[in-house]
């Protein structure tokens, strides 16, 4: 089971790497497409007559928060996966610290990697969002894990 957990962690890291490896134009197309398929559709439910100009305005308005939410979510899941791996190898007291350290270092390396991609840059703000997402994932899963452990005793 340890190997399976490690594989999921590495595959998730590879997914994050693949997103970071996209040029800015390609990354924006994905974000804008997602916003068009979700947020714009929701707007259309409540307001049938949305012009193309209004659609573009909606996309522009929501691009930044959606992209940051994507960072948070990817690293929230990474935090859970790191926790599951570290749990198999770590003393309970250091579980959260080691899990968070893995995620923080990966977030730093991810931002460093983006320096070498056309149109991309590194952002300390993104590292902070990523780390916070990881901390939330780790914390929620830790609490959930504690409650399950108490019930089984």
Regions found by a protein language model. Name each.
Residues 74-88, 132-147:
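Membrane-interfacial alpha-helical segments at the cytosolic side of multi-pass membrane proteins
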Residues 108-129:
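Interfacial helix-loop-helix junctions of multi-pass membrane proteins
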Residues 2-4, 89-98, 123-124:
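Membrane-helix interface segments
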Residues 1-73:
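"…centered on the first transmembrane helix and the immediately adjacent amphipathic helix/loop
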Residues 69, 100-108, 127, 131-135:
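Residue-level signature of the transmembrane alpha-helical core
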Residues 64-78, 124-132:
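Membrane-interface loop-to-helix entry segments
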Residues 11-16, 95-115:
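Small-polar-interrupted transmembrane alpha-helices in polytopic inner-membrane proteins
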Residues 149-153:
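Short, charged juxtamembrane terminal tails flanking transmembrane helices
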């Amino acid at each position: 089971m340890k190997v399976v957990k490690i594989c999921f962690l590495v595959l998730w890291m590879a997914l994050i790497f693949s997103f970071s490896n996209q040029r800015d134009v390609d990354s924006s197309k994905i974000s804008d497409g997602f916003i068009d398929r979700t947020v714009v559709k929701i707007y259309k439910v409540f307001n049938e007559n949305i012009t193309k100009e209004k659609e573009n305005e909606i996309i522009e308005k929501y691009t930044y928060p959606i992209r940051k939410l994507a960072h948070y979510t990817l690293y929230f899941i990474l935090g859970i996966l790191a926790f599951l791996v570290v749990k198999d190898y770590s003393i309970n007291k250091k579980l959260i610290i080691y899990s968070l350290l893995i995620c923080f270092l990966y977030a730093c390396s991810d931002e460093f990697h983006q320096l070498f991609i056309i149109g991309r840059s590194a952002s300390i703000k993104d590292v902070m969002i990523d780390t916070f997402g990881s901390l939330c994932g780790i914390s929620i899963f830790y609490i959930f894990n504690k409650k399950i452990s108490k019930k089984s005793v």
